[in-house]
Amino acid sequence: MDLEQDEWMSQRQRQQQMEFSRIGIEVIGSKKDLIVNSMKNHETTLTIINETYRIVYYDQYESKFTSCNIITFDGKDKRSIKKMKRVVQKLSNESTNSSHQFDLHSHALLQSSSSSSSSSTSSSPSLTSSPSSPISTSPPYHSSPQLLEHLLHQQQPITSVGSKPSFFVIINLYNDDRQSYMSEIVSFAGSFQFIEWRNDESWKEVFKLSSNLLTYHVKKNELARACTLGDINLLDEIILSGCSKSQLKEAQGAGYTIVFNSYTSYSSGSSLVVSGTMALLCAIVENGTFLLLSKSNITRFPMSIINMCSQLVELDMSNNRITEIPIEITELKFLKNLNLSDNLINDIPLEICNLTLLKVLLLNENPLNNFPSSIVELGTKKLLSFCRNILEGKSCETWNKVKLMFVGEEGVGKTRLCKLLIGSKYNKKKSSSSSSSSLSSLSSALSSSSSSSSIINSNSISNSNINMVNIKNENQVTGDTVSTEGVNIHDFKSKKVEFYAWDFGGQQIFYPTHQFFLTTQSLYLLIFRVNDSNFAERVNYWVHQIKAKSGISLPIIFFVGTHIDSCTPEQLSMAESILKSNFIKYSRVKQNVINFVSCVTGKGVKELKKRLIHESEKSRLIKKDIPGSYIILEQRLSNRGANQGRMSISNSASNSSSSLLNSSSSSSPSLTSKKSSSHLKHSQQQQQQHQQQQQQLQQSIKEKYIDYDDYLNECKLSYLKPHEIKDATDFLHNLGIILHFDSPKLNNLVVLDPQWLADVMSSLITFSHSWIKLGILNHSDLQSIWGGRYKQTLWPSLLKLLEKFEVSYQLPNLSKSLIPSLLPDDPIGEILEIKDREWVPLKLAMENNYVQVFGCDYHFSFMPLGFFARLLLRILLIQGIDIKTYWKDGVLLDILTPSDKIKQQQLLQKKSIFEPTTTLSPFLCSLSLTDSQNYSPLEPPPLILNSPRVNRKFISNSTSTTSTTTSTTSTSTTSSNNITPLSMSSITPYSPTSPRTPSFSSSSTTTSSSSSSSSPSSQFCGVGCHRNINKNNGSSNELIKTLTKINNQNGSSGELIKTTTTTSTSTSTTSTTTPTTTTPTIPIKNNNNKKLPINRTVSSLCLTAKPKLQALITFIKKKSFEQSHDNDSYKLNIQVRTYNTTIDKEHSVSLFFQQLLFTIDTLISGSYQGLEVTRTIPCTHCIQLNPTIEPYHFDLGDCISALEDGRSHVYCGNDPNTPVRIDYIAPDICLKKVPTFTDDQILYERQIGEGGFGLIHKGKLISNKSDIAIKSLILCNSNNNNNSNNNNNSNNSNNFKNNNNEDEFIEKFQEFQHEVFIMSNLNHPNIVKLYGLMHNPPRMVMEYVEHGDLYHLCQDKERYASLGWTLKLRLMIDIAKGIGYMQNQNPPIVHRDLRSPNIFLKSLDENSPVCAKIADFGLSQQSVYSVSGLLGNFQWMAPETIGVEDESYTEKVDTYSFAMILFTILTGEIPFDEYSFGKMQFINLIREENLRPTLPFDCDPRLSNLIQLCWSTNPKKRPSFTFIIKELLEIRIDSIQTSYFDSPFLKNYPASI
């Protein structure tokens, strides 16, 4: 084994030897074999000038090329004395001759160079002895490129023309008994170095001396070569590798000799060209103060200048190819003038401000991609001040860029007005291309001014006049308009302000995407046609759209009326009056915000400009106190694509992908300046430049957006501190430089080019193509939409990007995408058929008394377009539902009952009967929760749509196909959503009509005979059923029989198996349903508790005794401005129906209703914070009396107040004598499963705690004397709750409503109800039990845990010190079991507030059944797919839950918090107490820098690894609690065993036992 290892090592050593270049040393003399053989057995590598070599020692007869000589002598041979004399004499003579040959060689080289450059050297500055004149450098290779290229590319050996260095090795072995003549031999060595070889270790001295001689020799030759060629880069590399000043002085002397010999012998002029290398050597050796290295082809800043020229006062390095200024330049303390112009520098280090004597810094003609050129243009003093302010953390820079938003309806003149403000003429013929181009920047306008008549020289908004061009009046009066698709961005400047003008497309189809571009810190121009009789309605929409985006602060809105040429003074006066009375209140600015202009004559435009500039200054849109790092960040991002116009993409469909490259190339920043590029004439340099440009071009094309981690790196490179990043991001977002959203789907994305994003969005939803039918896009049609615009390889990425912005949703397993904004406005075609078939008219349902109805209405003062499209996608993710159909403003669904889920499980178990016999119609789909959880919120659950060429009915070779369907169910552990996609059958185009919006007050269209007799669940199959319908009816009938048998086996004798027979022909479609059993009559209680028989005279939907739960959610939009004060102008209507059952029996209804309301509230609070929202509840008594009229609506607060007053009902406003049960109209706020206690059943003892939620008392249940804890909700500032007397704890909830805001009252009660709801569904020994609740005030009666909480235990150091290691592990295990139980719920429970105060200790005996329990579920949520919200207690919270308001997260946040609890149990300390940062700094360090507590050094390695896994920054890396519990149990078992075997008892026990 050892031999094999030695052989492997030898092979490895030989392989490594071959990787290095070799330097040979010739060994001469009688003892050469000893030296050669010994040195071969040792590692002999060395590094010379950043290159590694291996020294190889050769015998003189091996005829290898060598660079050094070793001459050996036998120290115990007297003849060696004479040999030494002869050798020394010969070497001395060769040294003299080689020196002369070296001078001749260098002289000849310089002569060849000088003779070919004599014509150009005359123009170079002369070399003088005056100290005030810097040494001029103009390397000879500039004038003789052919010679230079030859010299640079030739392969020269590492040697010189002169003799090789030599040294002596005298063998004087100690184990040799002969007489030594060492002293005599050495006496004749003279100046030559020698080594005495005594033993085997002497090889080290030989190698050391060999290395030193070779290094010196190579560096000497390379110095000569660098000086001869004028290669400053090589000279700098040599100096930095380690050259003594004596070596440099020697090189300088040799260089001067060559230069002056050349001058006296060959130069005919009076001036002398001195190479840059000689100038640098002179500055180093003579400690010079001036150095000029211009035009020296330097590629990097020579660090030798910084290290060895500390006295420099003036440094000129212009006209080179330097790419970076080193931070170490600040070592040049005496530097006053620094010229770095005409290089390739991209950034300037802030530390340059430490050059306190610097007066002149020239940086012109540099790319400066990562440093604001505007600062450089202000001069050296301002630049240094700018850098110093950033380093010192000062915020004193001015930002004069203002985002100007042009909004309004289509055809009002936004684009024309924008061009007039820019200062350009308007050309009708060019308008189309101008509007379709992705961006018109000022620079492009100026560059084309000579060839385009539509551009004029005026390019700024200022107080000076602007040239206007008259456009024929008829163009405007006749309605000749320019259409902007999506958003176009322009920019125009004045001396005081630079506007970024955003021109929003006015077509309604683009409105849903506008929300991503509206920002708070903007100046809005709301443009409308004064001669439009309905202009108030148009203005009203945009005013509320802007207000909704601005939140609580009022935006700055200028109202600009156009087309005044065709208006009378009376019309203008009336328009102004309407604006003042209705809309001016929504603008922060009240004066001079109403403007009337003419885009034909330019009337009013000049005044509008002045007002915009004035208001920008007055309203502080021009910032004068921002950090300079913001400006650097903007510059860096602009370099990557955030600068508008840098990477424009043509909208012309005819453009090829190559034109995209060309257009991007023309707008990309140049890698070299114009001056420096003129010197790069060599083919290799040009090729390198071309490759760099292509590389940057490819990068610029890709970087339309970057991920957030990349953005954070840019922030770090911009000198932003972690706590400044959010403010900087918001600042640039509000200005429109970038787009970044804190929403769960978009927080990891930073859009660098908003114009590009607008183009991508508009290209998909534009009105100019008709490829998307009924909201469904076939990916095969993308060629017609994106072909020529974007490379086909980018299409999948673009689709994913649009999914993030909720514009499109790619349907899994299909090459199709859903475009919600392009869904039909109203139910039409098959959508209408499904709706009419599944949703029985309310009047008919109520007349037959087989249905119970409840719901609620959300009333909005305004709602932007696109709201319901976003809500729809969230509804699709709610579990336990079966989507029937949907359209733009509505969705119809079934709510799955427990029996449905049981049957689905049985269907899954018997899925073998559904062996595929033919292809299933493509519209059939199913989705389980397990599948949906594999999709992120960015990827909606799988939806399957049928082909647009296939009718929605079953298609077969025969004329009819019979199919059987069952209710959608799920397994016992997962719920399912069956999502019915829209039909893609051939439907004739439709014209939008008035909305068909079902509500409680209107009856639906009477169901046709065919639809009323069809099955409610027709055309759907269960989850996981790969069901296929045979082409013959026989097989289908067998399938029906099998399904019937399954249902009968399930005990559902009263249920129906519906058989749907569908006949597909070109002209007609029929459907029949045949019941298989007789359905008994089931009585249902109405609100008055009267039993009402169910009439079986309605459709087959109602004939079955099987309970059925349905919901219809619709959105009603206002029709006109006159309806703006109507409560139903914007209303979200939710209607839920239960057939053949009651709300009391089917808790699935309440659960769905709670999840639906939570989904709606989350969307509104996250994306529509500026809206006024109220929620009302319709009276079911009114609906039962007359479903055709509007019912009375209860206020939500009234229902809550009634519950708190102990009343189970409220009274109808239309019939005050009729009580209505609250649990029937608002089951979400009633928790009927939870027992209720009264005051006479509870005995209060003392207060034991207090928190933000309320007070906690210890008490007893009077019935069994058991200890309890009572948690009370604080509803007022009264101290009554502190009293132990039961009577004093009662409180009138109305007092709260009278003294506090009603919204706060509702919010607190809902939080209380939420915690009760969560706890009522938990039953685990490691979770504090809920016994019941009390009203007036709201209270929870819970299990009492006697040993207090973990926090106070750790604060008591004596108690904590008494905890044994195995007890600590037991506490960890108990807590892990409790959390694991919560995460195994369906859906999982996210506690969100796990910390030591919420961990209670049941026992401190590790052998007790229970030691620790989890409590306080006030912040808990059921994770449908993720939850969101900003949390406190940052020490315990996961990074994704702190610092960002709308960031989403899953149950993995509790895993992170559990790691902090483990740390607390392990150390007794609060996490992060070891640090002393501020809260915001803590949050940023935790989120961005992965700051974590320090684990004890003696922590068990397995526990340490487990904790680090649990607090991983990436939630996906955090382990499951199954794994966590297993690991903790193993650690505890090992600890117990170790403790047992280490016990004194075992140690003293006889070893034989």
Curated annotation (Swiss-Prot):
SUPFAM superfamilies: L domain-like, P-loop containing nucleoside triphosphate hydrolases, Protein kinase-like (PK-like). The keyword Repeat applies. Residues 113-142, 643-696, 955-1019, 1048-1090 are annotated as: Disordered. Residues 1242-1546 form the Protein kinase domain. This is Probable serine/threonine-protein kinase qkgA. PROSITE patterns: LRR, PROTEIN_KINASE_ATP, PROTEIN_KINASE_DOM, ROC. Residues 648-675, 683-696, 956-1018, 1059-1090 have a biased composition (Low complexity). GO terms for biological process: G protein-coupled chemorepellent receptor signaling pathway; negative regulation of aggregate size involved in sorocarp development; negative regulation of asexual reproduction; nucleus organization; regulation of actin cytoskeleton organization; regulation of cytokinesis; regulation of pseudopodium assembly; signal transduction. It catalyses: L-seryl-[protein] + ATP = O-phospho-L-seryl-[protein] + ADP + H(+); L-threonyl-[protein] + ATP = O-phospho-L-threonyl-[protein] + ADP + H(+). GO terms for molecular function: ATP binding; protein kinase activity; protein serine kinase activity; protein serine/threonine kinase activity; protein tyrosine kinase activity. Involved in growth, and during development, in aggregation. The active site is at D1393 (proton acceptor). LRR repeats lie at residues 287-309, 311-333, 334-356, 357-378. It holds the Pfam family COR-B. Belongs to the protein kinase superfamily. TKL Ser/Thr protein kinase family. ROCO subfamily. Residues 395-619 form the Roc domain. Residues 694-893 form the COR domain. InterPro entries: COR-A, Kinase-like_dom_sf, Leu-rich_rpt, LRR_dom_sf, P-loop_NTPase, Prot_kinase_dom, Protein_kinase_ATP_BS, ROC. ATP binds at I1248, G1249, E1250, G1251, G1252, F1253, G1254, L1255, I1256, K1271. GO terms for cellular component: cell leading edge cell cortex; cleavage furrow; cytoplasm; lamellipodium; pseudopodium. Keywords: ATP-binding, Kinase, Leucine-rich repeat, Nucleotide-binding, Repeat, Serine/threonine-protein kinase, Transferase.
